[in-house]
Amino acid sequence: MAPLDLTRGQTDACSTENKDILCRNVLIYGHCRYEDQGCTYNHDQNKNSSQPEAPSKKMFNVDSPSFTPSGQSTVLPKKTTLSSQAASAAPFTPRGGGTPTLQTTAESTMFNPAAIREFTPQNYDLGNNNANGISQENGLYPDPFTMSTMGTALPTAGQYNLPLYGDHSGLAAPGAPFYPPHAAYPTGPIQPPHYHLYQPFGPYRQELQPWQRATYDFFMPQNLREDLQKKQFATLQVIPNSGLPQLEHWHSLVPLDTSNRKNTSCFGYPSWVYKAQNSRNGRHYALRRLEGYRLTNEKAILNVMKDWKKIKNASIVTIHEVFTTREFGDSSLIFAYDFHPLSKTLQEHHFQPIHGNRYRPPPAVPENTIWGYICQIANALKTIHSNRLAARCLEPSKIILTDINRIRLSACAILDVVQFGMNSRSVVELQQEDFVKFGKLILSLATGTLPAHLNNIPAALETLGNKYSANLKSAVNWLLDTSSGETKTIEHFMTGIASQMTTFFDLALQDNDEKLFHLAREVENGRIARSLMKLLTILERGDYDGVPSWSETGDRYQLKLFRDYVFHRVDADGKPNLSIGHMLTCMSKLEAGVDENILLTSRDNETVFVLSYRELRQMYDRAFNELVKASKTGAPGANT
């Protein structure tokens, strides 16, 4: 920038008046190149500072008070510092000795950040109809988040009066300390609840200190999630080109046996287990096949299924269908049961030897686990015996473990069909045999010996007494005792183990509370997906109601900017910001309609909006309701 030429147009009359005025070139550049060429202004800074400053009556002074209209009664005092209005004043150029006049420019006033009041959050006022300073909209779209409408629904002040999440200053007035003392709860007006946070409920608690947090305080427990995912994968598992046939409406057969050896000790026929899908309902079932069985009496299936379909018990695998087929190249009998993925038999879980440096037997089963098995099998036998039936198959290879210490009888009704009309024993005799098999099963679990290898039961009972309590030994001895000649009942047995039944029942209730706790936290995990679907039906929509740019105008344009704010963010280097937490937080706040302001900017940075989530929620509802009204039948779940 060239220095100002202050010598042009000067007169002698003006020279005398300008000699006491400090040259502006000296102030700006430190010197004046026209000092020796006739510049009439003062060039000595020391001289200017030593002389008293006389206010100029003719020249413009930056220290003069700002202009005040004549109608204003109060006169502002003169400021001693440089006024902010001087920044927008016209450049100083001396033109003569006359009285200068201020010239107005057509340029707009510069943006002054100091003139904007700083936003200070105030306390909520439930009695105020417009607590947020935003005009309420009447008509078809009432505001569900108005504090006046929530005041009647919320409890009175002092009840549940907890500070808002993330508000460390509680409910105090502006200027309160950032971390106030927590001696008592605040007594001001209550805050609205967090509808965008889904708080789990239930009495489930873990032994943690108040300042401690576990991972599943924020997510589903990792082991539970992995277990559910593995079971889902196992349910959907298929084997291409397996060579297994399709059985009428059963398809996609997958073998579940871990051994390919044929075993006829339990049913008298080799049996195999498959997973199959039912084409009628799409569900998966477990099919148990008896190889080489030839049905001689059709009433066997009808009568047995009529009796066993009535059995509904949590410790028994439900049977659904029995049929014969020749698709395997022979005459086979098929039983369809409920499918429990990743389940193992008690024989696979407890009787498999451990192979290491030396061959050693499996470890002993804890007594609490054995008592849990006893309570569940007793529960199953009570239901079976109450319906004048017998379990008949209490083998470790036919009882499955579906979860931790959770067992089910999986081969019921098979012997009733296979031996239909051939068995001369009564139901009471078969029920008494169930008690003996029950006792051998528990004794084999306690001693680590399969029931078929229990040749010396008294010696096994002595071994049991050395490792476990006297109550367990007494219960097993009662089940195995056949010398008394009395008719045993499952009710009598359950009376003797009432203490253990109560303990197991309490553990089951605690487990149910824990599952309910995690379920309550996941009950609304699909709400963000539904909100996103509704948002996408509004954005980028083509011609609507004769308006080609409907989605680019009005409220829809601001929703489009909100979409960019949530999903198209970049960091300081211009790289995509893929923070899932940011996306979930923004969509949750939009769903809740909170009063938090955000800055929305267009992609060309020409348009800027400062909007709250509550205003965006109103725009979001109006736009979607407009689409719903225009549709013929409406949108299913539009009001969810």
From Swiss-Prot:
Protein function: Regulatory subunit of the poly(A)-nuclease (PAN) deadenylation complex, one of two cytoplasmic mRNA deadenylases involved in mRNA turnover. PAN specifically shortens poly(A) tails of RNA and the activity is stimulated by poly(A)-binding protein PAB1. PAN deadenylation is followed by rapid degradation of the shortened mRNA tails by the CCR4-NOT complex. Deadenylated mRNAs are then degraded by two alternative mechanisms, namely exosome-mediated 3'-5' exonucleolytic degradation, or deadenylation-dependent mRNA decaping and subsequent 5'-3' exonucleolytic degradation by XRN1.
Domain of life: Eukaryota
PROSITE patterns, per the entry: PROTEIN_KINASE_DOM (PS50011), ZF_C3H1 (PS50103)
GO cellular component: P-body; PAN complex
Lineage: Eukaryota, Fungi, Dikarya, Ascomycota, Pezizomycotina
Family affiliation: Belongs to the protein kinase superfamily. PAN3 family.
Gene Ontology BP annotations: mRNA processing; nuclear-transcribed mRNA poly(A) tail shortening
Biological source species: Chaetomium thermophilum (strain DSM 1495 / CBS 144.50 / IMI 039719) (Thermochaetoides thermophila)
Compositional bias annotation for Polar residues: 43-53, 63-87
C3H1-type zinc finger segments: 17-46
Region (Disordered) location: 43-101
Signal peptide: none
Pseudokinase domain: region residues: 237-498
Annotated transmembrane regions: none
Protein's recorded name: PAN2-PAN3 deadenylation complex subunit PAN3
Coiled-coil portions: 499-537
Domain notes: The N-terminal zinc finger binds to poly(A) RNA. Contains a pseudokinase domain. The protein kinase domain is predicted to be catalytically inactive because some of the residues important for catalytic activity are substituted and it lacks the equivalent of the binding site for a peptide substrate. However, it has retained an ATP-binding site and ATP-binding is required for mRNA degradation, stimulating the activity of the PAN2 nuclease in vitro.
Pfam families: Pan3_PK (PF18101)
Keyword terms: ATP-binding, Coiled coil, Cytoplasm, Metal-binding, mRNA processing, Nucleotide-binding, Zinc, Zinc-finger
Record: residues binding ATP: 263, 288, 338-345, 397-398
